[in-house]
Amino acid sequence: MAKFVSIITLLFVALVLFAAFEAPTMVEAQKLCERSSGTWSGVCGNNNACKNQCINLEGARHGSCNYIFPYHRCICYFPC
């Protein structure tokens, strides 16, 4: 009986060690830096148009209209 308990204990320890080493690693979220659009002209009033322009023309991850004194501007977000 003692041999059976030691084998079960050994298997349990091996399973715990295996689970510890096989845990998925989390990738750190990529930080985004914002920059005024270089291709947008005028006041930004359409978030979707700004987003499409940032992605398609400037290669950004996304874009949005943000208020930066004195008016709304199209801001593009790029990986830092």
Swiss-Prot record:
Subcellular location field: Secreted
- Indicate where the modification Pyrrolidone carboxylic acid is found in the sequence: Q30
Which InterPro entries does the UniProt entry name for this protein? Defensin_plant (IPR008176), Scorpion_toxin-like (IPR003614), Scorpion_toxin-like_sf (IPR036574)
Q: Identify one Gene Ontology CC term for this UniProt entry.
A: extracellular region
Which regions span the lipid bilayer? none
Primary localization = secreted
Signal sequence, start to end: 1-29
Which cysteines in this chain are paired by disulphide bridges? C33-C80, C44-C65, C50-C74, C54-C76
Name the UniProt key words of this record, in alphabetical order. Answer: Antimicrobial, Disulfide bond, Fungicide, Plant defense, Pyrrolidone carboxylic acid, Secreted, Signal
Instruction: Please provide the Gene Ontology terms (biological process) for this protein.
Output: defense response to fungus; killing of cells of another organism
Q: Does the keyword Secreted apply?
A: yes
User: Do you know which Pfam families this protein is assigned to?
Assistant: Gamma-thionin
Q: Which family does it belong to?
A: Belongs to the DEFL family.
Q: What the protein does?
A: Possesses antifungal activity sensitive to inorganic cations.
By what name is this protein known? Defensin-like protein 4
